[in-house]
A protein has these predicted regions:
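Short, Lys/Arg-enriched N-terminal segments with co-localized hydrophobic residues
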Residues: 1-6
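Short, acidic/small-residue loops that bind anionic groups at enzyme active sites
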Residues: 111-132, 151-153
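Short glycine-rich or small-residue beta-strand-to-loop segments that form or flank ligand, phosphate
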Residues: 90-98, 124-127, 141
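Acidic/polar active-site rim loop that often engages polyanionic ligands
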Residues: 119-120, 134-147
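Short Gly/Thr/Asp-enriched flexible loops that form oxyanion-binding sites at enzyme active sites
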Residues: 96-117, 137-139
Length: 162
């Protein structure tokens, strides 16, 4: 039996707050931007339990630690997207809900900076209007659309109308 290979027509990216396992992102070639959190006076990337395992994180909270968070900055987005643009790929980025974070604004600043250098490319930024598992479900659906060979415009249209 022949296996049909479908070329992806765009690159999908998201934020670590989509709360999917790191293996999901690796297996599906989805770069993610890391939010950061501060705990006990030290800053950590929210890299899905790689820098601080989840059991350690939750034990610290149970022991009284009070973490705070910071959003992704424009420079981090530029570092994530520029190699994709250089390779000739357009980008769809799905952000954490604008209702709970301003990270979409950082993404827009990065997009505008990069498109001035890569005017032939496209960067579509989609507000997930969700968080955690709801956000993750949207990323999973976008991944499926990308894998099916949908164009950036087709995928965006489907996501925004559903």
């Amino acid at each position: 039996m022949w296996k049909v290979l479908i070329m992806k027509l765009f690159s999908l990216t998201c934020c670590s707050t989509a709360d999917m396992p790191v293996d999901f992102f690796r297996q599906n070639d989805i770069p993610f931007s890391c939010f950061h959190f501060i705990m006990d006076g030290k800053e950590y990337p929210d890299d899905l339990g790689q820098s601080m395992p989840f059991d350690v994180f939750y034990k610290k909270i149970a022991d009284g630690a009070e973490p705070s968070t910071s959003q992704v900055n424009a420079e981090d987005y530029e570092k994530m997207w520029e190699p994709l643009l250089e390779s000739g790929s357009d980008v769809m980025h799905i952000t954490l809900s604008s209702g709970i974070s301003g990270t979409i604004n950082s993404a827009r600043v990065a997009r505008d900076n990069l498109l001035s250098r890569y005017p032939e490319r496209k960067i579509e930024i989609i507000d997930s209007l969700g968080a955690s598992s709801g956000y993750g479900l949207l990323v999973t659906t976008a991944c499926t659309l990308c894998d099916e060979g949908k164009t950036l415009e087709e995928a965006r249209s489907w996501i925004e109308s559903n």
